[in-house]
Regions:
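Long, low-complexity intrinsically disordered regions
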Residues: 1-211, 216-217, 223-296
């Protein structure tokens, strides 16, 4: 949701404002696995057309829905439930299939229905968009496997394997504690360089790319098996507390109260850094100061 996107930006970009996610350089869409993404406008095709089904049936469904939606809207914007009714859909969420054409944008603020509208088709082929999506995934999540890419993107294992095969000459095989995987050859130098300085504390929102991992990859980020279910819960995930670049706990917010659950005893300096991060979160509509409550 946009608030999570805003906090992800805040964790990485200085002077993030409550309205930063609404910048004209950004767009909202139903992206990989039909989840809501906020991405750079120039990357719209990558995160939409890159997930277009390879099979004829899936492709027809996406393209037919997109064409019908474009016709119904006629250049206007509409709540997605109303658009679903206008198309005779028994479930308006089926509109998400149309997003894989790269012609559907949305505005969703979390509490209300999403507003949908259509835009011209991207000037890029589905294949090129898919391969760039795989490159982006490898750059952020690598070392990675075709299987993990297929899970994350929702395109399935066969299509993911095909994408990695197409990129084979630009990939480098690596061995990790959880198995063999791949990185971009262009990232090999970065992977071998010792990490630079990191922020003392960061609060990452639910679903942040830093810990949006599946399967055994989670073991690399949180080695303690007893702690992993606390971060990757069966329902809505909490946020992750980063201290000196390592996940050291979880956090949730209710109104103006941020509750931090630390996994280990932390220093007073680290505690102060976490509290400073929490009180500086650029939360839209929050008028009172943030209060931090600790659970240890």
């Amino acid at each position: 949701m946009p608030r999570a996107a805003l906090l992800s930006i805040n964790a990485r970009v200085a002077e993030t404002k409550p309205a930063s996610w609404e910048d004209q350089s950004l767009v909202q869409l139903w992206g990989p696995r039909f989840n809501v993404y906020v991405v750079a406008r120039r990357d719209l095709a990558i995160f939409s057309l890159g997930t277009l089904p390879d099979d004829a049936k899936g492709m027809r469904r996406a393209e037919d829905l997109a064409a019908r939606l474009h016709s119904v809207l006629g250049g206007t914007r509409m709540r997605h439930e109303e658009a679903g009714d206008a198309l005779g859909l028994h479930n308006a969420n089926l509109l998400r299939y149309a997003a894989a054409t790269g012609t559907v944008l949305i505005r969703w603020e979390g509490a209300k229905q999403a507003t949908v509208w259509t835009v011209p088709p991207p000037a890029v082929s589905p294949r090129d968009a898919r391969l760039e999506l795989a490159r982006r995934y490898l750059h952020v999540y690598g070392p990675a496997t075709p299987e993990s890419f297929g899970q994350w993107s929702g395109i399935g294992p066969r299509s993911a394997v095909a994408a990695f095969e197409a990129l084979r000459e630009s990939l480098t095989p690596v061995r990790t504690p959880v198995g063999d995987a791949w990185i971009l050859a262009s990232d090999e130098t970065i992977a071998l360089v010792a990490p630079g300085p990191v922020a003392r504390a960061r609060l990452l929102p639910s679903g942040d790319a830093f810990f949006l991992l599946q399967g055994t990859d989670r073991e690399l980020l949180v080695p303690d098996a007893a702690r992993r279910p606390e971060l990757w819960t069966p329902r809505v995930w909490p946020g992750a507390v980063l201290i000196d670049g390592e996940i050291s706990g979880t956090w949730r917010r209710a109104g103006t109260t941020v509750t931090v659950q630390s996994w280990d005893r932390i220093s007073s300096a680290a505690r102060e850094a976490v509290e400073a991060e929490a009180t500086a979160l650029p939360l839209p509509g929050v008028r009172r100061p943030i209060v931090v409550r600790w659970e240890e």
